[in-house]
Regions:
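Beta1/beta-strand and adjacent pyrophosphate-binding region of the FAD-binding site
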Residues: 24-38
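Core beta-strand elements of the Rossmann-like FAD/NAD(P) dinucleotide-binding domain
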Residues: 26-28, 206-218
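Conserved mid-domain beta->alpha element of the FAD-binding
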Residues: 35-43, 146, 221, 365, ...
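Glycine-rich FAD pyrophosphate-binding loop
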Residues: 47-67
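Active-site-adjacent segment of FAD-dependent monooxygenases/related oxidoreductases
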Residues: 64-151, 170-172, 269-275, 282-285
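Helical element adjacent to the flavin cofactor pocket in flavoenzyme catalytic cores
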Residues: 134-161, 184-200
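Conserved FAD-binding catalytic core of PHBH/FMO-like flavoproteins
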Residues: 148, 158, 201-206, 218-337, ...
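A conserved short coil-to-beta-strand element within the FAD-binding core of flavoproteins
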Residues: 162-187
Length: 401
């Protein structure tokens, strides 16, 4: 029996008109929906076994907001087999920069405790058992490496399409037929420019039609924790309600590197606890000044919209602390652990100093996202029929900004 699935909120009269105007058809053994680490790895692996595929990714030039960063040992072994371990190692920071977790009042403040994760017998034993120990590399950088490898391996008939989304798909006895739409609109073109241009590798890639009909033996759903393919199939994620909500703030602070090195305070994670903020700072690359702040907030008690760039900047300042020459109190922020308003005069007076008198390490906020920490497991990865398979890296869910 044929079954057809439509993604809620995608189809519209306008999109249907576009698809009718400029549709094209592809026939491939495998359709990959999603161009993250798993989708790109799948494309390369299929090419290695002589199987052409078509990969469709909604974003045009990848994602710049750092997300996952720790590549575990088994993943590194698989990436070694793919032939990209050297490129990953070349971009991974020195281990001394990320072997510790630190607990502190602020990054430059009082150090409460530190855990060296590479000092125990377990790490020594693991290092003897594998040629490819774990690495620490930001997901956008890993995706760039995997994209280049997928393009290098692409067979005749293999395509890597950026700026395309899967609108619907139908299962039938011979596999799957899917409808893809190019994500292009006047508003998107004005806002993102080339970001949403379609890029392809392989047969007829230069045509970049507005819509594609793809006939495939298999559909690989690699479109992440919020997979619309998975949702359309009715495959649920089982688990409790979100454990915590966060503002994820990408910022750069190159000036931190020498200050941390001269004090021997490098780490991967900094758990910061002070009157201005309680948060975790993730050092993706200390030498390059690449950081992400995970600032918790509480829906229902806080207005997420009010936690804007200024509020996030204040939270980061509180977590970084003061320069070595400063002795002012920690600046307040909307992520304060006290119940009083961080902008009130009582907050400033109780700290003994106003926020303006505090000198912190210079930094620049690049992007802000929101996500919910959850503990969920998909009920099934395969339907066992119709060529449908769900693949995932299982990262913490972080919605598109």
């Amino acid at each position: 029996m044929n079954r057809k699935f439509f993604f809620t909120g995608i189809r519209s009269p306008r999109s249907s008109a576009i698809m009718a105007k400029a549709a094209s058809t592809r026939r491939v053994p495998a359709l990959i929906v999603g161009g993250g680490p798993v989708g790109l790895y799948a494309s390369s692996l299929l090419s290695a076994y002589g199987v052409p595929s078509l990969l469709a990714e909604r974003a045009a030039n990848g994602k710049s907001h750092p997300r996952a960063h720790l590549i575990n040992t088994r993943s590194m072994e698989l990436l070694r087999e793919l032939g990209v371990e050297r490129q990953i190692r070349e971009q991974t920071p020195p281990m001394d920069e990320w072997r510790h977790f630190r607990y502190c009042t602020s990054v430059l403040g009082t150090q409460i405790a530190a855990q060296d994760h590479m000092a125990g017998r377990e790490w020594a034993a693991l290092s003897e058992m594998t040629p490819s120990p774990m690495a620490h590399l930001s997901q956008p950088k890993l995706e760039a490496i995997l994209r280049a490898e997928a393009e290098r391996r692409a067979l005749g008939g293999t395509e890597l399409l950026s700026g395309y989304e899967c609108v619907s798909f139908a299962q039938h006895g011979g596999g799957v037929t899917a409808q893809l739409r190019r994500v292009v609109s006047p508003a998107a073109s004005a806002s993102y420019g080339a970001r949403y241009s379609a890029v392809g590798t392989g047969a007829d890639a230069d045509a970049a039609p507005d819509a594609l009909t793809v006939e495939a033996d298999y559909l690989l759903a690699c479109d992440g924790a919020h997979s619309r393919v998975r949702q359309a199939l009715g495959l649920r994620l089982r688990g409790p309600a979100p454990l915590q909500h966060f503002k994820s703030v990408h910022f750069v602070a190159p000036a931190l590197a020498p200050l941390l090195r001269e004090r021997g305070l490098e780490a991967m994670l900094y758990f910061c606890f002070n009157r201005g903020a309680v948060a975790v700072l993730v050092a993706h690359n200390i030498s390059q000044g690449e950081w992400v702040a995970q600032l918790p907030f509480f829906p229902g008690l806080q207005d997420a919209e009010a936690l804007d760039r200024a509020a996030c900047t204040a939270g980061i300042a509180a977590c970084l602390g003061t320069l070595p020459t400063g002795h002012a109190a920690t600046p307040p922020s909307p992520f304060t652990t006290t119940s009083s308003s961080p902008s009130s005069s009582s907050s400033s007076s109780s700290s003994g100093s106003s926020a303006s008198s505090v000198t912190v390490v210079p930094f620049e906020v690049k992007s802000i996202g929101s996500w919910a920490m959850s503990s969920k497991v998909i009920e099934r990865l395969s339907l066992g029929r119709g060529g449908m398979q769900v693949l995932t890296t299982a990262p913490p869910p972080l919605p598109h900004r």
